[in-house]
Structure formats: C-alpha cells, structure tokens
A protein has these predicted regions:
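Glycine-rich phosphate-binding loop plus the immediately following alpha-helix
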Residues: 102-110, 121, 128, 136, ...
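A glycine- and small-aliphatic-rich helix-loop capping segment at beta-alpha/alpha-beta transitions
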Residues: 13-18, 78-89, 111, 135-140, ...
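Short glycine-aspartate micro-motif
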Residues: 1, 62-66, 173-177
C-alpha cells in the first residue's frame, strides 16, 4: 500500500510473484477537499478496497498487509512491525512533517484489525541514515532532516545492484526519485548518507512543490 502526494499505488503478491499492480491518480481538486493527510484516510481506504474488489480479492484471505510509512520518529531502514504506538506517532506527525505516505501504515493497521493477518512497514520516509556533515545548514541551529523517498530509492538501488551482479551494500550510487515529489540521494555502501529534503521543498521544483 503506497500512498503518494498525487496517487495511491497498490500491489497484490502471492509469495514473490506480483499478481496485480495499479496506480490510482487523484485530481488536485479532489485532494484539496482534505486539509491534512489524515483527512484523506477514508478516501484512500475506499480506493484500496475498490482495488481489491475489482480483482475479486477477499481482504480476509490476505496474510500480510504492508504499508508505506512516514511522519513518525526517525528509524532505521528495513522492515518494522506496525503497532498502536507507531500508528499514534504517525498520525500525530511526530517526525515533523505531514505527508500522505504515512497513510500506508494507518491503512495496513485498519485492514489488519478488521480482516486479520500481519502488518509491516518497509523503509518509510522517516528513515534517517544521514552522515553528520550532511545535517548543518548555513543558519546556526538549523539542521537538515532526513525526509526522502526511501522505499523507492532503496528498491531501485537494489534492483540496479542485482542487474550488475553486485550487492547494494557494496555500491556507491546517486539515485533520483521523480514523481509528485523529487529527491536526489547519495547512497554509500547501503546507507543514504546525503539527500535533498523532499518534504521541505528542497531540491528541484516538482509537480507539487516549489523547490529551492
């Protein structure tokens, strides 16, 4: 479950086989009806359930719900179990930003509570691997945050490494995510050590952000 600033991307897997993938785009006038990302939750839930219904998938037959996340406290990269504390921190924007990515955690939690199964988040936007020298700005006391498209960045980097016959952890890469938001990130031996701060409008202008 991958909610973005302009779309909801949903995939259904059986083991490692991708059975269905769909990107449902949301018009700007529709999104402007919702003052905050939290307010979009019922709309995004309907989109998700409509996707499952369209493909004749019973939510009760799903073993694992995985949601994109973000907006909670900083955490390490990888897979994390979704629990009530994470959902609360996510809903309250403990990480200091408000972005629809966080709805992946909330949707996975809601569906799991109704239909059963397990629930995880993978590489949410609040993963922080920045090196110390990437944090200072030109203003005393103001530091850069780690807010980037971690899920796609690390996913594409891993695919690229596999094509090269190498491990992601052995490579140095520059990865650019281009969508409603754009982030450009330096990957060093499996860590995202420097990046533009997408949620704060850092970097190039995008379809939904002014840029710097």
């Amino acid at each position: 479950i991958n909610p973005g600033s302009t779309s909801t991307k949903v995939s259904y897997f059986e083991n490692e086989k991708n059975i269905f993938t769909e990107s449902i785009f949301h018009d700007a006038p529709e999104l402007l009806k919702y003052p905050t990302a939290n307010d979009q939750l019922p709309m995004r839930r309907k989109v998700l359930l409509d996707f499952l219904g369209k493909h004749n998938i019973d939510p009760g037959d799903i073993d694992v719900f995985i949601g994109r996340g973000g907006c909670a406290y900083s955490q390490r990269a990888g897979v994390m179990v979704i629990d009530e504390r994470l959902v609360e921190d996510t809903a309250r924007d403990r990480g200091g930003s408000d972005h629809p990515a966080k709805l992946g955690v909330m949707l996975a939690y809601d569906l799991c509570k109704v239909y059963g199964g397990k629930m995880y988040t993978v590489n949410p936007t609040n993963v922080d691997e920045l090196c110390d020298y990437a944090r200072p700005t030109g203003i005393a006391g103001l530091y850069r945050r780690a807010q980037t498209h971690v899920l796609n960045q690390k996913g594409i980097a891993a695919i690229h490494a596999k094509k090269l016959g190498k491990k992601y952890e052995d490579l140095n890469l520059i990865v650019c995510h281009v969508d409603g938001g754009i982030t450009i990130t330096a990957h060093c031996k499996g860590k995202m050590i420097d990046s533009t701060e997408g949620a704060g409008g850092d970097g190039p202008f995008t379809p939904t952000r002014l840029g710097s």
